[in-house]
Amino acid sequence: GKESKLKKHLKKVDILILNHGIYNLSREYSNYENSIQINALSKFKFLNLFEDIALKNESPTKKEIWINTSEAEILPALNPSYEISKSLIGKLVSFKKNFLDTDSQKKFIIKKIILGPFKSELNPIGIMSPKFVSKKIYDLANSRNYLIIISPNPLTYLIFPVKEFFNF
C-alpha cells in the first residue's frame, strides 16, 4: 500500500520489472487476501504509477514495465491463491495495455512475461533452470512482442495469444 512513496525513485527508471510476490500453500482466508494484495493489486498500483510517470516524462526514451504473470492465467496451478492472484494481475495488465491510446503508446510500453515452472525458492520442483529462463527473457526482451512466453508447454504458446486477442 506504500507504492507511491517510491515515485521519486521510479522517475529515474527506464525499465521496471515486476516479478514474483508470494506463494503460500495455506488455505486460510488471510492467505488469499495477502496473495491478491501482493501478487495482483500492488503490481497494478505500480503499473498505474509508472504509467503516470511515463506519460509526464519529457525524455525521448520510452518507459517500459514488464510484469511477470503466470501460466496460471490459463492453466490450473497447484496453489489456488496463487492461481487467483496471478490470473487477476494478468487480466489487469491486459486491460491496461488494451486501453492505452496511441499517444500513450509512444511513451509507455507494457510487456507481459509468462513463465512456466522454473526452479526457484518458490517452486523447488520447477523443471526449467533459472539460467535458461533468464537467458530466454533476455533474448526476447528486445522484440516488439507484448507477450514474452517461456514455457515447456506448447499449449501456452497457442492459448495465450488467442486469449489476449479476445481480451476486452
Language model features with spans:
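Conserved Rossmann-fold cofactor-binding substructure of NAD(P)-dependent oxidoreductases
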Residues: 1-13
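Hydrophobic structural elements of the Rossmann-like NAD(P)H-binding subdomain
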Residues: 17, 66, 108-115
